[in-house]
């Protein structure tokens, strides 16, 4: 073997081992990074699960008037809620079912709350989506699911036609209240009793 061949062989083996070292070094931070993000997710999960457990205990001991809520099954992040139509409202006598979905980011992100029971309301669309500021931009970690349910009950008593999700119902509410109320009562009787 000549000196040139020997140098080339040494050079290629040292560059090969340096490549392997770089590859190892490159993969190590990725592993650490994924462990960090997994750890962060676990921490969020445990924070959210603890908070949801506490709220479940609170709502079981002291439910908001005309409301109930709790997990659908074993999954603490999936709840079913029942709201009775507020007395004196066009929804009186109705029983409305809602789905509540918490994310691992709860309480830093709002829960997703949707009506499962059809309802004639300018702030609730046909898919059950609710237009309520505290479920969007005005969410605060200080809010609880009990306060959310109370706000929804309040929305059933006093809708917000100035910020509608269903424009035609809002217009009817403002221009022909008697017809609006008749339709809301009819839907309540048909879908919520």
Curated annotation (Swiss-Prot):
Pathway: Protein modification; protein ubiquitination
Keywords associated with the record: Acetylation, ATP-binding, Isopeptide bond, Nucleotide-binding, Nucleus, Transferase, Ubl conjugation, Ubl conjugation pathway
Localization in the cell: Nucleus
EC number from the UniProt entry: 2.3.2.23, 2.3.2.24
InterPro entries: UBQ-conjugat_E2_core, UBQ-conjugating_AS, UBQ-conjugating_enzyme/RWD
Main location class: nucleus
Catalyses which reaction(s): S-ubiquitinyl-[E1 ubiquitin-activating enzyme]-L-cysteine + [E2 ubiquitin-conjugating enzyme]-L-cysteine = [E1 ubiquitin-activating enzyme]-L-cysteine + S-ubiquitinyl-[E2 ubiquitin-conjugating enzyme]-L-cysteine; S-ubiquitinyl-[E1 ubiquitin-activating enzyme]-L-cysteine + [acceptor protein]-L-lysine = [E1 ubiquitin-activating enzyme]-L-cysteine + N(6)-monoubiquitinyl-[acceptor protein]-L-lysine
Post-translational modification: ISGylation suppresses ubiquitin E2 enzyme activity. Autoubiquitinated.
Subunit structure: Interacts with RNF14.
General function of this protein: Accepts ubiquitin from the E1 complex and catalyzes its covalent attachment to other proteins. Catalyzes the covalent attachment of ISG15 to other proteins. Mediates the selective degradation of short-lived and abnormal proteins. In vitro also catalyzes 'Lys-48'-linked polyubiquitination.
Protein's name in the database: Ubiquitin-conjugating enzyme E2 E1
